[in-house]
Amino acid sequence: MKPVFDLASAGVHYGRASAGVSALRDVSLSVQPGERIALVGANGSGKSTLLRLLHGLAAHTSGQVVRDTGRAHAMLFQRPHLMRLSVLGNIALGLWLRGARWGDAKRLAQTALVRVGLTDLALRNARTLSGGQQQRVALARAWALSPQVLLLDEPTASLDPHAKREVEALIHEFAHQSEAMTLVFASHNLGQVKRLASRVIYLEQGRVLADLPVEDFFSGPLLQQQYPAAHLFVKGESA
């Protein structure tokens, strides 16, 4: 099966070669359709840069990056980028810009709002909503586009516990709507990683230091023996 993403010794370097910053270094990995992958690591480890590279928002400066362009992608950020439009308008506009007729775009947007439980807020200015509601609008906007690949950069990090549970439940539903749906997300929440991921990639200083099935990543003895840096990270985050 053709990989969704295939990286070979990929690097991302900002600034001059001699004095810049290497955000990613020599990253090699393959993502298959239907995988649910968590990216973990400390702040500045390269998680966000890797997600942006996968989505095409960052360019690799070394190595090779191959994307399956036949699969539609959607990406959600920690803070949703919503326009000064109604909730419905924020969703419908994206569809219209991709060629849908305005009436069809509005109908698809309304269906997406049903899925995230925001039909009663359809005409509200999206920027007046709470953080959790805004993230649900962003999810609805992605849902309406019917992507086969969903990339998430700390999607619940800035939310209160109740909103966090709601958004995580929607992400879980989104990720399991078909066997071919691919999910790649960055998170500091190890409980969330256990609930959503089937595979975990640990990054440190722009390098992949561990790439394991989720059950092996949380196996203390295995991680401690073979991936001591990842073990220390898990131990610290769980403290």
Kindly label every feature range from the protein language model.
Residues V40-A42:
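The feature captures the beta-strand-to-loop junction immediately N-terminal to the Walker
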Residues L150-D153:
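Catalytic Walker B motif of ABC-type/P-loop ATPase nucleotide-binding domains
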Residues H55:
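Helix-to-loop junction immediately C-terminal to a conserved catalytic motif
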Residues G103-L121:
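Conserved ABC ATPase "signature" region
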Residues S187-H188:
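H-loop/switch region of ABC-family ATPase nucleotide-binding domains
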